[in-house]
């Protein structure tokens, strides 16, 4: 987010050259993952997040609520396989993530979901809205707020998890993930 902010501030004309953005960040109407109210990406630089979302550049926002719809359990992670090196590496990363903390029960696909939606927008339904990010240093610092007006941000609402996991499995040639 910070890099986009810097680009737009230093080169304002660049905004007119961008058709749209797909961003992963924020926690609209859901619990944050850094604080009760804030998601990590927006918490790190809420001023940049708020600025980017207010430019008028069309944004598809994949927030935590969306990402929490595409989770993989520890059991599934240990039961899948791939014959490709890239697929094996992806599985290894997920399994190792679970190994860092025995209380972890679900791996959520944050950036992979944003990438998948940028490739195939039909993976989700959307709410067109205006969004702001709290920038004042209060307990709500970094919180993402949607106004549900006809705005330039398409907030992901419902994700087709089956379609996402089919895409994920096909892309990485993963076996044992799909029924």
Predicted regions and their residues:
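Conformational coupling and interaction surfaces
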Residues: 40-47, 62-179
């Amino acid at each position: 987010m910070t890099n986009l902010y810097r680009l737009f501030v230093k080169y304002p004309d660049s905004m007119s050259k961008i058709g749209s953005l797909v961003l992963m960040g924020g926690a609209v109407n859901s619990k944050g993952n850094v604080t009760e109210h804030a998601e990590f990406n927006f918490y790190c630089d809420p001023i940049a997040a708020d600025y980017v979302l207010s430019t008028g550049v069309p944004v598809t926002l994949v927030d935590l609520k969306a990402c929490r719809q595409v989770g993989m359990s520890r059991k599934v992670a240990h039961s899948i396989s791939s014959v490709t090196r890239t697929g094996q590496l992806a599985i290894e990363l997920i399994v190792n993530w679970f190994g860092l903390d025995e209380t972890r029960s679900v791996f959520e696909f944050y950036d992979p979901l944003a990438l998948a939606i940028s490739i195939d927008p039909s993976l989700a339904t959307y709410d067109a809205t205006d969004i702001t990010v709290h920038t004042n240093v209060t307990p709500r610092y970094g919180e993402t707020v949607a106004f549900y007006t006809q705005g330039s941000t398409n907030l992901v609402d419902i994700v087709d998890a089956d379609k996402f996991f089919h895409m994920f499995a096909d892309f990485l040639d993963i076996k044992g993930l799909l029924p």
